[in-house]
């Protein structure tokens, strides 16, 4: 590795250590520093280090969000959920999803795709067919509910005047009621509640208190949902998506992946019988956290695992092979709910 390549790696490691939440794609071409980054300070630090070494380069690095996106730097998900991909291609791995009504920051465009950052800080590529794109004021109006009453979906469906379904709203989707019997979607479509339930955002804390028993009750509503890598809805969910989606409804914001979630909250001894309802249990393979489960108390956990193929309950003190293996991988626990 050349000295310059090593320097680029060092700066990336300091300022943008996790490509899931930051971008540092910078290289040297001729006498110019080119590429793009979300971390403006990283470029300044790199240029200073190069100057110390007697190297002067033209700074042509694009700071994200791309200035060329003026007026199109925000997006709202307007389909039931939108897939987030690792690369700008449908064949690329799905790394996450965002549900209808979620507000996203648009960082850049490539090959007709949008690189976005969600409310949880996660960065990935989304096809614009999932999204409505606009300005900051427009997105903030939606996000704050200033255009009407902000509502959260519990698997609701909207119908038109003829009773036909016009939208299926997954758990946690956000819509606006700006007329007595009319619900507005981010793309302007309207309908009336035809099935399921819509909970006012202002009543979320009452309906979904940050208590262990209430969190476990919510989690039970997900039993039997199929396992899906990158999923966050009851159409399919992975381990960290399950935990993130449930706790978000209870007012607890968590990062997207298990190895990120393990750094949140108060550390606990990873002893199955001592975990309370709502605590998080983390499991590792080859010394890396790869799985998270939600404690139900008394050694029981509810989780989405490929070994079960769905969201299921397992006993960390049980005798089944899958339960013994799971217990052997338990390495950490965290309490994210208030005492």
Model-predicted segments: where are they?
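Boundary regions of SH3-family modules and the immediately adjacent low-complexity/disordered segments
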Residues: 20-24, 44-69, 73, 89, ...
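Short, well-ordered loop/turn sites that connect or cap secondary structure elements
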Residues: 92, 98, 169, 274-275
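Structural motif
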Residues: 102, 173, 278-279
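Aromatic- and glycine-rich peptidoglycan recognition patches
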Residues: 133, 205, 268-271, 296-339
């Amino acid at each position: 590795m050349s000295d310059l390549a090593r320097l680029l790696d060092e700066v990336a490691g300091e300022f943008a250590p996790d490509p899931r939440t930051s971008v540092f794609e910078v290289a040297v071409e001729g006498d110019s520093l080119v590429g793009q980054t979300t971390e403006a300070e990283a470029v300044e630090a790199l240029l200073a280090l190069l100057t110390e070494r007697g190297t002067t380069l033209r700074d042509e690095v694009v700071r994200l969000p791309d200035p060329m996106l003026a007026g199109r730097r925000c997006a709202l998900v307007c389909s039931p959920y939108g897939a987030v991909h690792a690369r700008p291609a449908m064949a690329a791995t799905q790394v996450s999803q965002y549900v209808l009504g979620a507000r996203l920051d648009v960082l850049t465009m490539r090959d007709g795709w949008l690189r976005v950052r969600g409310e949880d800080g996660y960065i990935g590529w989304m096809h614009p067919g999932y999204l409505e794109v606009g300005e900051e004021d427009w997105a903030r109006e939606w996000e704050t509910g200033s255009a009407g009453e902000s509502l959260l979906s519990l698997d609701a469906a909207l119908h038109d005047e003829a009773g036909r379904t016009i939208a299926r709203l997954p758990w946690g989707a956000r819509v606006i009621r700006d007329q007595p019997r009319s619900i507005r979607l981010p793309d302007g479509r309207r309908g009336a509640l035809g099935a399921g339930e819509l909970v006012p955002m202002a009543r979320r804390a009452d309906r979904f208190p940050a208590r262990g028993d209430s969190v476990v009750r919510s989690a039970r509503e997900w039993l039997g949902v199929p396992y899906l890598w990158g999923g966050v809805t009851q159409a399919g969910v992975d381990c960290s998506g399950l935990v993130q989606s449930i706790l978000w409804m209870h007012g607890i914001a968590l990062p997207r992946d298990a190895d990120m979630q393990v750094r949140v909250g108060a550390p606990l001894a990873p002893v199955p019988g001592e975990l309370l309802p709502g605590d998080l249990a983390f499991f590792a393979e080859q010394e890396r956290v790869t799985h998270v489960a939600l404690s139900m108390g008394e050694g029981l956990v509810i989780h989405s695992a490929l070994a079960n193929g769905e969201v299921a309950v397992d006993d960390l003190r049980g005798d089944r092979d899958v339960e013994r293996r799971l217990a052997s991988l338990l390495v950490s626990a965290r309490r994210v709910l208030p005492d």
